[in-house]
Amino acid sequence: MIFSIRQNATLPILKMKVFRDGRNDFRRFEELIENCVATFAMKDEKTGIYKVANKAANIALENPCDENGYKHYIITYQFTKDDTDKPGIFLGEFKLTLFDLANPTQVYGELIAPIQEELYIHILDSFVKTDIV
């Protein structure tokens, strides 16, 4: 997956769909994902140095008013100017920390996405000055 954003930009918001793989109990997965903590990390592809390390991300229903009652979730991250101040190619990952429903202080597990392919983030060079004087 490739996501592009301009240098010093804060939009567009990065969005990734959470797919159900069919290997887990759907109801349990929905309960776990509704009570999880999402974070985002991004590192430079060449140097391996983290530009963003475990900053808060959000989980939301893609379509809260779905007529069929299906729940499709998306994970989102809002970039800051500090996140995008250096042009280049970066690798991004979301981490979902799922908490045990019976004991909310215990971690049930962690899910790192994307699973099937890398998330490449291209921060494109920009000549526009973004600060308003």
Regions inferred by a protein language model and the residue ranges of each:
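Contiguous segments within soluble domain cores/interaction surfaces
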Residues: 1-133
